[in-house]
Design a protein with these regions (language model features):
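The feature encodes the CheY-like receiver
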Residues: 81, 124, 142, 154
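C-terminal output helix
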Residues: 174-184
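Alpha4 helix (beta4-alpha4-beta5 surface) of REC/receiver domains from two-component response regulators
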Residues: 130, 153-168, 181
Length: 190
């Protein structure tokens, strides 16, 4: 199966054909919500703390047959992927990983789609923000919650990610407790 279109863009349409509900956009957020995110991100960055922002996704797919959530971790740092996979597995999640364009396409074509995607912003062969936009436009994957992971956090980058449909933003390096809280928030786990 050809995973890329002639233009080299990622093409997931051949793997999925059922429509999904579109994710709410940043533009649909109230001005108060936007100001809260902006102010919070700015203050955290000024104080030197790392930033973690997460909002509950409007709709999360049903649990797998074994009652666990599945998470797809996408990052070009294979060592970080190993650590994430081990830690998240110990926390009870089913974890899949992808580290380059080919493995990303292969994982996104699998059924069922993941309940959550952890997505690195800065990868060498594809921008995490570009991939996020493609995911949000995809009929089958558009409603899958996405938490962005990045080492380059500015208020503008956070706003750009949230405006393009990210459900959360976690800066690297991160503490697993902060990432775990963001995951639980987005998935609605109490």
């Amino acid at each position: 199966m050809n995973a890329t279109s002639d233009s080299g863009d990622l093409d997931f349409t051949k793997a999925f054909d059922s429509p999904a509900q579109p994710a709410p956009s940043w533009e649909a957020s109230s001005e108060a919500q936007k100001q809260e995110v902006t102010a919070g991100a700015t203050e955290l960055l000024k104080s030197g703390y790392y930033i973690t922002i997460a909002r509950k996704a409007p709709k999360v797919a049903p649990l797998q047959h074994d009652g666990r959530y599945s998470i797809l971790c996408i990052d070009d740092d294979t060592e970080l992927l190993k650590i994430l996979a081990r830690k998240l597995s110990l926390d009870g999640y089913v974890v899949r990983t992808a580290f380059d364009r080919q493995s990303i396409v292969a994982e996104l074509q699998k059924l069922p789609p993941p309940h959550l995607i952890l997505l690195d912003v800065g990868m060498p062969d594809i921008s995490g923000l570009d991939l996020l936009q493609k995911l949000r436009q995809h009929p089958r994957l558009g409603s899958v919650p996405v938490i962005m992971l990045t080492g380059h956090v500015t208020p503008e980058s956070v706003l750009h990610g949230m405006a393009n449909g990210a459900d959360g933003y976690v800066s690297k390096p991160f503490q697993f407790e902060a990432l775990g809280t963001a995951i639980e928030t987005v998935l609605g786990i109490q």
